[in-house]
């Protein structure tokens, strides 16, 4: 590529449409369509991803079989534990019946005392609750006023945060509108990457001519997009 062509590529690199580049690839014979005359032994990324997914599914299936075997062993162990627990429950049942009889005797002897203590406790509790209610009514206006102040402060803080977020969003939109221009080195690195990918397998003169044709089309696309971008910027300055 000449310096002038690379200059156009560097100036309009971000404005190149992916669909235009795809058309250039297909016209140059690199597309895998029905009329394609060039084939490579390289696997596509989609095929590699599918193979990896199949391997992961096989590994997951083996892991599930191992989990099922472990579950069967746990069930057998659980059955043995249940038998032991049933025997323990029967022994505990005999002890519980004796304890229940002793508790019934103690409850019957203490029913009279509990009735008197309960009546006295109700009287004492009523007096204390009555004093607390009067004190709370006296403090209610102050409490409600403080709650109102806290609500107003929290509302004002939320409004300030919303305003700050709106300003940040506007700044981000303005930054997105600006298209960064790559350097000369970045443009050369891109074309070197494309060439390395296309020439990764043995090629003949016919394939080499296709690569040169592809580079010519890419330069043409970048020139067209550069002119389009320059015209849009000119209209923006006039407005």
Curated annotation (Swiss-Prot):
SUPFAM superfamilies: Dimerisation domain of CENP-B (SSF101160). Gene3D superfamilies: Dimerisation domain of CENP-B (1.10.287.1090). The keyword Calcium does not apply. GO terms for cellular component: chromosome, centromeric region; nucleus. Residues 28-185 are annotated as: Disordered. Poly-ADP-ribosylated by PARP1. One of its GO terms (molecular function) is chromatin binding. Residues 176-239 are annotated as: Homodimerization. It is found in: Nucleus; Chromosome, Centromere. Residues 46-117, 148-179 have a biased composition (Acidic residues). The modification Phosphothreonine is found at residues 37, 39. Keywords: ADP-ribosylation, Centromere, Chromosome, DNA-binding, Methylation, Nucleus, Phosphoprotein. It holds the Pfam family CENP-B_dimeris. Its main location: nucleus. Antiparallel homodimer. Interacts with CENPT. Identified in a centromere complex containing histones H2A, H2B and H4, and at least CENPA, CENPB, CENPC, CENPT, CENPN, HJURP, SUPT16H, SSRP1 and RSF1. Interacts with centromeric heterochromatin in chromosomes and binds to a specific 17 bp subset of alphoid satellite DNA, called the CENP-B box. May organize arrays of centromere satellite DNA into a higher-order structure which then directs centromere formation and kinetochore assembly in mammalian chromosomes. This is Major centromere autoantigen B.
């Amino acid at each position: 590529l000449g310096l002038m062509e690379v200059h156009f590529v560097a100036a309009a690199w971000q404005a190149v449409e992916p669909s235009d580049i795809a058309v250039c690839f297909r016209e140059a014979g690199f597309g895998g369509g029905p009329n394609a005359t060039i084939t490579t032994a390289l696997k596509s990324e989609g095929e590699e991803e599918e193979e990896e997914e199949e391997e992961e599914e096989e590994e997951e299936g083996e892991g599930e079989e191992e989990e099922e075997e472990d579950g069967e062993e746990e069930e057998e162990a659980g059955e043995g534990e249940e038998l032991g627990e049933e025997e323990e429950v029967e022994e505990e049942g005999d002890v519980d019946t004796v304890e229940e009889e002793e508790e019934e005797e103690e409850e019957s002897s203490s029913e009279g005392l509990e009735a008197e203590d309960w009546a006295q406790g109700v009287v004492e509790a009523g007096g204390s609750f009555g004093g607390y209610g009067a004190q709370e009514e006296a403090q209610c206006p102050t409490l409600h006023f403080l709650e109102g102040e806290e609500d107003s402060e929290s509302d004002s803080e939320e409004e300030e945060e919303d305003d700050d977020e709106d300003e940040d969003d506007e700044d981000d939109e303005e930054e997105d509108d600006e298209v960064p221009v790559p350097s000369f080195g970045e443009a050369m690195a891109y074309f070197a990457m494309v060439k390395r990918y296309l020439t990764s397998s043995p090629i003949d003169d016919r394939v080499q001519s296709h690569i040169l044709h592809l580079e010519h089309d890419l330069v043409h696309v970048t020139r067209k997009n550069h002119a389009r971008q320059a015209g849009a910027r000119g209209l923006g300055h006039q407005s």
